[in-house]
Design a protein with these regions (language model features):
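Short alpha-helical elements
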Residues: 1-256
Length: 256
């Protein structure tokens, strides 16, 4: 079982409709469906191999598409992050940002060609403990700094970080200016081609950069969710849904 009674009390208001649909088949138990989605997320099994102890695979797949399409998983992640922040369990003093590559074996939406092959880029923002606060996906050939705003869009006023720490992929004056307008400091080592007269970082803020292993560890945690290792979903929104659920699974046990 992936979902405890305490977890479900938090998740139910967003996932469970106030009134079941009047047309079509009866509305299956949302908790059982979510358990099935978590099972696929963790094991990486194909849909046709979903055990019969779960609701039918067609029901589970349809609900994944529904919840991914109506941003239910985004709302859940934001809600849990906000709840943890209110309890003082989120470290917003310094947050880390990075991206990784997920090969897309079956192609589909939002797939880009790189030296590693065709795939999708996953960007994460984590707090000082490595807890995922926001995630976004794009074609693998999209520059990482272009994805930052979308990743930040998951945040509320209560969960905005004070500073972001990233690698050279985030050394961009335009990004620095955009984040500064939001009251957020971007810390990243300079690219080799930056001219000396345009240097914006000194050694003091960059001392925080040595802790970037924190976000790399979070990617390793997510890698234990086998459905995220390779993208099989044709629809980008469905892979986004699995990704956000992976982040959510890392946060739920902190609610206790």
């Amino acid at each position: 079982m992936f979902i405890t009674d305490e977890h479900w009390r938090v998740l139910k208001p967003i996932l469970e409709p106030a009134q079941a649909p009047r047309r079509g088949r009866p509305w299956k138990d949302s908790r059982a469906v979510l358990e099935a989605i978590f099972f696929i997320l963790h094991t990486g099994i194909q849909w046709e191999h979903l055990p019969k102890s779960f609701p039918p695979k067609s029901t589970v797949h349809d609900r994944l598409q529904l919840w991914s399409g109506n941003h239910a998983f985004r709302k859940l992640l934001a809600k849990v992050v906000r709840s943890l922040a209110q309890k003082g369990r989120i470290d917003l003093d310094q947050c880390f940002i990075d991206a990784t590559f997920a090969p897309a074996k079956g192609g589909g939406e939002g797939v880009g060609l790189t030296k590693k092959g065709k795939g999708t880029k996953l960007q994460l923002i984590v707090d000082g403990q490595g807890l995922p606060l926001g995630a976004s996906l794009a074609a693998a050939n999209v520059a990482e700094w272009h994805m930052v705003q979308e990743t930040l869009d998951l945040f509320s006023d209560q969960t905005e970080p004070e500073r972001l720490i990233g690698d050279k992929a985030y050394d961009c004056d335009e990004l620095d200016e955009t984040l500064a307008e939001l009251g957020l400091e971007m810390i990243a080592p300079h690219r080799k081609n930056r001219r000396p007269e345009n240097v914006t970082q000194d050694g003091r803020p960059l001392r925080r950069y040595r802790h970037r292993w924190i976000v790399e560890r979070t990617f390793a945690w997510l890698g234990a969710r086998r459905r995220l290792l390779v993208r099989w979903e044709k629809k980008l929104t469905n892979f986004v849904g699995f990704t956000l659920l992976g982040c959510l699974s890392l946060l739920l046990h902190r609610l206790s």
